[in-house]
Amino acid sequence: MTRRSRIHRTLLTILAFSFAVFSQGAQAAEREKLLSDLGVYGTFAAFKVDMDWWKLEKGAREAATASVKEVVQKHADHVIVDTYLLRGLSEHADLLLRIHATELIHNQQFLVDFMRTGLGVHLVNTSTFNGLTKKANYVPSFPDDTKASLKTPTDAGAKPYAIVIPIRKDPAWWLMDQETRVRQMKEHTDAAIPYLKTIQRKLYHSNGLDDFDFITYFETANLADFNSLILALQQVKENQHNRRFGNPTLVGTVHPLDDILDVFAR
């Protein structure tokens, strides 16, 4: 190989590496934007693996899980998919998918294809929740010191546990005047503020999209703090208007897709 050829090959390698890094960075930025934007649809789909799956040969399970990666790649331009292992921590499901898109139909199209994969045909869909991210209803009416406290950043570091709790309010809540609701949500918020550093939360509005009114999503590395948070929230007046809290409550651990598929391919 001539010196010019070696230089040319080196330049191509550098360009390819730079493009890959740029592409990964762009994908990460797009992901963060979609997860933080308002007007984004979130779908939580929980599944149990049927008994026939474990009767397959290991090679067949590996081939079946490989088809899942193809579906995720196919829909990558329209949806962001997060994966969670519930097996061993929840009787409700073995696997949870959290899907985000700017249109709910994109979540549906992904799930339809996912359930046609070699793994998907062995999954029983035990729960599906749909919600929409919206601006805060009550925070604009809170005192400035409360607003400032709500900006407390969550501690850095991995948060391996994920909890999903759907909530349905009673009719009295929706008939309540705005001032009273703001006051009760202020009490709710004050109870939650001490845990902002260790628990990351995301709220989805589900009215008309699901049987629930809200889907609450949490990530944490400190389950003791999470337990204390829920106990604190159960002691405020607003809790009296929760007709349904959980049922199901989904508890799992956060894992990349490859790790999840490896668990089911073993």
Where on the chain are the PLM-derived regions?
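A cross-kingdom feature marking solvent-exposed beta-strand/loop segments within repeated
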Residues: 64-66, 78-96, 197-202, 212, ...
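Sec/Tat signal peptide C-region and signal peptidase I cleavage site
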Residues: 22-28
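Catalytic micro-motifs at enzyme active sites that drive phosphoryl/nucleotidyl and oxygen chemistry
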Residues: 31-32, 81-87, 114-116, 151-153, ...
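Bacterial N-terminal signal peptides
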Residues: 12-22
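Short S/T/G/P-rich N-terminal loop/turn motif that feeds into the first structured element of a domain
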Residues: 28-76, 104-107, 128-194, 207-211, ...
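A common structural junction motif
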Residues: 114-122, 234-242
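Bacterial N-terminal signal peptides that target proteins for export
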Residues: 2-12
